[in-house]
Structure formats: C-alpha cells, structure tokens
Amino acid sequence: MKAVRYCHVRGCKVYVTLNTLVNDREMRDAVAAAKLASDAGADALIVQDLGMSYAIRCALPDIPLHASTQMSLHNLAGVEAAAEMGITRAVLARELSFEQIRFITKNASIETEVFVHGALCFCHSGQCYMSALIGRRSGNRGLCAQPCRLQYSLGGRMDDHPLSLKDNCLVDQIRRLEASGVHRHSHRRLRQGYPRAAQPR
C-alpha cells in the first residue's frame, strides 16, 4: 500500500502483473492476491489466464483488467473476446506487424498497448514449452530459464546463438504507433548480463 501511494503521489499508475497460468488448486490464492492488490489501490491487474480473469472479474468487478501479451491476443476476434470478458486493455502479441497492430487498434472496442522494447521469444509469446522441457521451468508459469539464449551447435559450431532473437526495439516508431491509435507502449527493463543486441522490426 505504501508503494502504491508513493507512485500515485508522483503521478504514476500501478499495474500489478498476475500474468501466469494457474491451476484449480491455486485459483483461490490467485484471487486473494488480486484482492490484495486492489485493496492496496492498484490501478489495474495484468492477467493471462482466462479462468483467473473470469474469477477476478466475478470477485472484483471494479478493478480494471489488462490482457497480458502472454494471453497471445494476435487478432481482432481475440481482442473482442477478451473485451466480452471484461478486459479493458489488450497488450497485443509482440509478433504482430505494424499493419496488424493498426487494424486491431482501429477496430477494437477496448484500448490497445504494445511493447516497444524488450525480448522477443523464439516461440510465440505465452506458447513456449522449451524451458519446461529442458530445465523443468515453465515459461508459461513465469519461470522461463531462457534456454533459447544459450549457445547451441549449428553445423559443428558452438560459437553462435541460433535461437536467440535480437531484441525488439521500436523506440523510433513510437510516434507512428501513437498516430495509429495505440493507447500505451511498454518496455521491459533488462537484467544485467542479458543480451543487449537490438534492432527495429
């Protein structure tokens, strides 16, 4: 609660991320965490799991819900389905082209948001099993070990990272995105030692 007040006094909004998949045994605790965030004054919750989104909407009808990029909303129909569930903003899938972003934003009944800087997954965001298979840490449960960032042999070479995509960097496209109607743009702070290579899409 103190942290939320600190942010609000300085004109910042607080979005609490609950963007992971939950099972039935965890649902009660997930909704309790959402209530704790709501009671603390969070401005919105960022969610991935459809069942948890429904449970939170039933328990906390007034807290705004934002669909995480992990929800893989990559078309207008998906965004509208999320809107029918009470989602008020869709963080669009990072894999979309500018034209796809513009079309969805122009026709969506809710706000849209896009990432302008951060990692791009080798798989489609929210659909990767690589970390779970290799390191028993599921990227769909918030525990990605980022095995795609490691070196792999390719034609006998071990000095390359064939699965590690260059980071997404749309900083020079922010005005263009705003002109298309996108409501928000996000970036993710990178950990020390994280590959820094980036290029515009």
Which residue ranges define each predicted feature?
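Active-site pocket-lining/capping segments in soluble small-molecule metabolic enzymes
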Residues: 1-73, 91-92, 100-201
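Conserved nucleotide-cofactor-binding alpha/beta core module
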Residues: 75-77
